[in-house]
Amino acid sequence: MKINTPVGCLWLDADQVGLTAISFEPIDENSRADQKILSDAKMQLNEYFAGQRQSFTLPFSIQKGTLFQKKVWQALQEIPYGQMCTYKELAEIITHPKAVRAIGQANRMNPLPIVIPCHRVIGQNGQLTGYMGNSGEGLVIKRKLLELEEALPKIK
């Protein structure tokens, strides 16, 4: 399912268990995708972008990822709306204090960006780093998401 958002098009996919993917690039949709899950995801994302939702109540079905990555993705869900933490702080939270770069890689592999809020993780010096592989467009999206959550002042 494709949806238009203030940060561009998002493509969603789900299986019978839960949401499997959110992508900024077109994806092959599961022909057996659960339409109710996709419809709920679309509604909740639209509410988020309208400033009416701060957390998501969607079932996930994450088939890929290492145990470490899944631990990171779980910890990301604990970062409150409108707040940020550094890669180092997140590494300490998951009790792998030297795994700062691995945290960045896990964020990059996050199958459900926005819903699993990897955009809330910033560099040690407070700079925005590492969204969608450090592409310029990715950092613009990260900034927009943080501005939406009022974690950053809006830049005109």
Label each residue range with its predicted role:
Residues 4, 47, 61, 100, ...:
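Short glycine- and Lys/Arg-enriched binding-loop motifs that mark or flank ligand-binding interfaces
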Residues 126-156:
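…primarily DNA-binding HTH/wHTH and HhH modules…
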Residues 10, 84, 106, 125-128, ...:
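Gly/Ser/Thr-rich beta-alpha loop segments that engage phosphate groups in nucleotides
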Residues 98-113:
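Regulatory, non-catalytic segments
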Residues 1-98, 148-156:
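Basic nucleic-acid-binding alpha-helical/helix-turn surface characteristic of O6-alkylguanine DNA
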Residues 114-121:
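Short Lys/Arg-enriched helix C-cap and helix-to-coil transition segments
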